[in-house]
Amino acid sequence: MQINYRYQLTPNITQLLQDLEVNRRLIDLLPSLPHIEHHLRRQSILKSSLFSARIEGIGNALPQDASKREISNILSAANWLYSHSGPRRLNITTINQLHGRILRHLSPDAGQFRSQPSAIFNQAGVAIYFTPPPPQIRELLSQLIRSLHSSIPGPIRASLLHFGFEKIHPFLDGNGRVGRLLSTFILKQAGYDFRGLTILEEYLEAN
């Protein structure tokens, strides 16, 4: 498996990028109200955590205590991304730290790449995609990170990262949750997180 994803800026995508840029600039022009923004961001992160859990079916298949822990961990990981002690750049360490926070007290493999083969199954239990073997994970992730050039528009970088990360599927569990937070991290770095007030997971669940 090689990381060599290509994309094409169609008229529709170009228009969407322009719309995002207009909205970003409009929000940047708004006066900063730290107290109100902090409250709204807290509500937004909480909703993002709940929608992220719903995307994965958490709450339907887990005991109540485990379900609460899953949601609490997602919330903690999202808060970490926005904290002063959060990561400053995307690298292997950031990915492992995110996974460690998301699977904290839920899996002995929290923060560790999988050491066995894995596959993606459909609802009928049939394997529809076989993930790369464990020895290739670290190098494939490094390739993916290197491919995200700063010349690529931020929203597209976030999409490429999410797509590539899920294809590599570096962990036995939690890949979807980590992938969505990594997308949020890229958008934040590129200035497209809209001050942390948008709920990406709500859109993903609906579409």
Please identify what each model-predicted range represents.
Residues 1-207:
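FIC/Doc superfamily catalytic core
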